[in-house]
Amino acid sequence: MRDIKIFYPSDVKLHMDALESFNVPLNVPMIDLNEGYSSCEICVTFGVPKKAGHRGELVKKIFDEHKGRHLIIEKGYINRDVYYAIGWDGINGRSNFNNKNSPTGRWDQLNLSGFKTWAHNNSSKIIVCGQVPWDASVQHINFTEWCIKIIEVLKDCGDVVFRPHPLDHGSVKFLM
């Protein structure tokens, strides 16, 4: 087996539980983020470095020292309380999930009923979905400014509706 180490935050139960479960078949060393980096070929973390918060700083130190591949675990995109996304060297669209040409079986097993085919008609609204400004996926931009600009551009294409993230309590309310 390759040299794999899992770096965990001892103060975030959700992250700890996910990483421990991930480690069951691997049985590789787990190292508290507070202990710092330990050399390995593959580094596993829950999430990526964040500009905000102590945990984000600790993960950044691990990323800065590690020269090999990163396997990153994050909460999934659907049924987020049940599923996780696991990808190489990034999150969201910047990760390699090794899912090219995957069969539809896993997707079909989700039995998701709320999804409809894409509707193309002139009466549809364009929905811009918000994000909490401290999320790692938007930490590299001014998210409020981005929302303002993208809504302005999209207004030429039809009615735009902004929906804030359910956990965002006010940072972009003026867009609604």
Set out the residue ranges of the language-model regions.
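Charged active-site motifs of nucleotide-sugar-dependent glycosyltransferases
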Residues: 3, 123-127, 159
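Short, charged/polar "capping" segments at the starts of alpha-helices
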Residues: 11-18, 52-55, 80, 136-137, ...
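N-terminal pre-catalytic "stem/leader" segment of glycosyltransferase-like enzymes
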Residues: 1-50, 134-135
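Catalytic donor nucleotide-activated moiety binding site of glycosyltransferases and closely related
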Residues: 7-10, 147-176
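A short, gly/pro- and small-residue-rich
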Residues: 51-79
